[in-house]
């Protein structure tokens, strides 16, 4: 494993295996779905957003391979109509996602993304990360593949 991969895993492992994993053990489904303040997102939304950004970021932008989301009908398993990362969602959409998301499906999706992330990071070195991304490819992923809603993409 390269030094950059080792450093990443030193940070990623406690985040995923302690902090994020702990939420599933101590936070109730009702707590996962509620918003602590009208302008804050639910834990379920935050977990989904983290997984979506990680999935798209590493799989599409770093490795230029299909996302985990597309490997096993994850939108169906999570009971969601969205494939974007949610950054441009309205408060009403955040409420809808928080209410309808299948939490077991979300948990399994996050675990699948984390497994893929570990496999990717084990292969990374500085040459992979130094490769520039073509504007057309970024446009394809962001707009055509639906990572960001068209009205939010400019």
Predicted regions: what is each one?
Residues 1-47, 52-154:
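Aromatic-glycine hotspot motif
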């Amino acid at each position: 494993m390269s030094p950059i991969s080792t450093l990443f895993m030193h940070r990623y492992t406690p985040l995923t295996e302690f902090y994020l994993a702990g939420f599933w053990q101590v936070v109730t489904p009702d707590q996962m779905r509620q918003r602590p303040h009208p302008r804050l997102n639910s834990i379920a939304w935050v977990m989904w957003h983290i997984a979506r950004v990680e999935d798209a970021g590493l799989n599409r932008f770093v490795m230029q391979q299909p996302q985990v989301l597309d490997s096993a009908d994850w939108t169906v398993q999570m009971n969601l109509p969205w494939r974007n990362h949610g950054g441009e969602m309205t408060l009403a959409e955040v409420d809808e996602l928080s209410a309808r998301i299948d939490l077991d499906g979300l948990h399994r999706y996050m675990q699948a993304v984390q497994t893929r992330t570990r496999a990717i990071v084990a292969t990374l070195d500085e040459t992979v990360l130094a490769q520039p991304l073509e504007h057309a490819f970024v446009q394809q992923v962001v707009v055509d593949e639906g990572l960001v809603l068209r009205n939010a993409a400019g």
